[in-house]
Amino acid sequence: MSITSEKKKSLINIYAIKEDDTGSSFVQCAILTERISNLTEHFKVHKHDHHSKRGLLILIGRRRKHLNYIKRKFGNEAYQELIEKLGIRK
């Protein structure tokens, strides 16, 4: 269910604004999107796992808050670019 450290490092390298940038909203959105996609695949097999579904909803809400921050702080262009890179719809 969790992502490997290698996958997390590759996401950090792709979405980091500057070197050693692990905490920016862009990186956190990318990591949350990866975790959400892993949980979505889990639910295709385990349809009745309601406890993990609550965790999924929490992750989606957390990602939504980061995306709203990016839109407010960096503008609509950065927001749209990130959504396209992540492959999520709005």
Curated annotation (Swiss-Prot):
Transmembrane spans: none
Keywords: Ribonucleoprotein, Ribosomal protein, RNA-binding, rRNA-binding
Pfam families reported in the protein's UniProt record: Ribosomal_S15
A cellular-component GO term for this protein: cytosolic small ribosomal subunit
CDD domains: Ribosomal_S15p_S13e
Domain of life: Bacteria
Assembly and interaction partners: Part of the 30S ribosomal subunit. Forms a bridge to the 50S subunit in the 70S ribosome, contacting the 23S rRNA.
Function: One of the primary rRNA binding proteins, it binds directly to 16S rRNA where it helps nucleate assembly of the platform of the 30S subunit by binding and bridging several RNA helices of the 16S rRNA. Forms an intersubunit bridge (bridge B4) with the 23S rRNA of the 50S subunit in the ribosome.
The protein's name: Small ribosomal subunit protein uS15
Protein encoded by which gene: rpsO
